[in-house]
Amino acid sequence: MNIHKITRYLLMLCAFTFLTLTAKGQDGEPLRLAVAGVSHGHLWEVISRLDRGDFKIVGVAEKDDYLREHNGLRDKLDPNLFYADLGEMLDKTHPEAVIVYEPIYDHLRVVEACAPRGIHVMVEKPLAVNNEHATRMASLAREKNILLLTNYETTWYNTNHEAFRLIDSGAIGKIDRINVYDGHQGPFEINCGKEFTDWLTDPVRNGGGAVIDFGCYGANLATRLMKDEKPLSVYAVLRQNKPNLYPKVDDDATIIVEYPSATVQIMGSWCWPMGRKDMHIYGDKGYIYQDTPKEMRIYTNGKERQEIAPSLNAPYNDSFYFLKAAVRKEIDVPPTDLSSLENNLMVVRILDAAIQSAKSKAVIQLF
C-alpha cells in the first residue's frame, strides 16, 4: 500500500470516527427532561421537538389546575406525567434536567426545588426578576453543583456567532459602540395567549415590562461582546406609550450602559411596527450589522459587503442539543457563554440598575 493510499485511508478513518462520535453525542440515550410550568409562550419550543429523539419528557409540573389540563403538551404525553406539585414530580420521575416555562418570579422556586436534588435547570430568559433572586439562585446552583443555564432565542443565531468570530479576529478593530434592537408590536398586539400575558404584563411576576422582556437580549449580548470589561454605569428611560394596554409596566425601554472602552445602547420595545432582533457593532476599523439570524453586513477597508453567516454545528445550534451536551458533560459552559450563569448574573444586574435608574432619573453606578 503506497503512502497516498495510507493517507487517504487515515483521513477516511478520522472522518468516520468524528461523525460517529458526533452522532453518538446527539443521539445516545435521550435526556430525561421535565417541564416546570406551561404558561410561557415559548412552550412551543418543546412541543415542536418532541419527536426528535434527543430528549424524553418524563414529567410536567403545573400548579394551575386549568392550565395543567389545557396546554399544548397535554394531548401529546401520557396524562399520568402531569403533576400539580413540582417536588412530587421531581421525586417520582427523576429527571436529569428541568426546563422552566414559569413566570420569571418563579424561577427561584424551581431552582430551590431542583438544586438540593442535584437536577440541572434551564430557564427562559432572563435568569431572574432581580438581583436578590439571581444571587440566591446562583448560590444554590454553585453549592449543589448543578448547571443553571438561561435560554435566549438569539443565542442560536448564526450571525451573532460569526460577529463574535470576526471581532475576536480584529476585523473591525476595537469596539467603541454597540446598539441592540429587540422588540415587536406588543404581547397583546401579536396575540400572545392569556396564560402568558397575565404574568408577562405584571411588574412582580415578570419583574417589569419591555425592559425585562426585551432589554435582557442586549444585556446578554453586550456582556459577551465586552468580555472582561465590567459595566461602569447604567442610565435608562422606561416609557408607557400604551398605558391603556399596559397600565402596570413599561412598554418601551432605552438602556445606556457605559463601559471603560465603549457605550452600549439597548433598545427593547413593545411599540415597534414590526418584530426585530438585530444589532449594530461599531469598531475603529469597521462595523458589523447583524440583521437577521442568517444575514449580516460587514464594513471593512472602506467597503460594505453582505454575507450569509455559516451555520452553527450541533450542539451549539439548538438549546435542547446544548442542554443535553452540557448535562452529559460532552461540552463545557465557560463563563463567557451566552447561556452561562456568570453572563446572566450580569444581565440581571444591568436590568435591575436600569429599573432603578428609570425610577430615580439618575445614573446608577455599578463598578
Sequence positions of predicted segments:
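Bacterial N-terminal signal peptides that target proteins for export
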Residues: 1-11
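Contiguous beta-strand/loop segments that form the cofactor/metal-binding neighborhood of enzyme cores
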Residues: 220-295, 321-330, 353
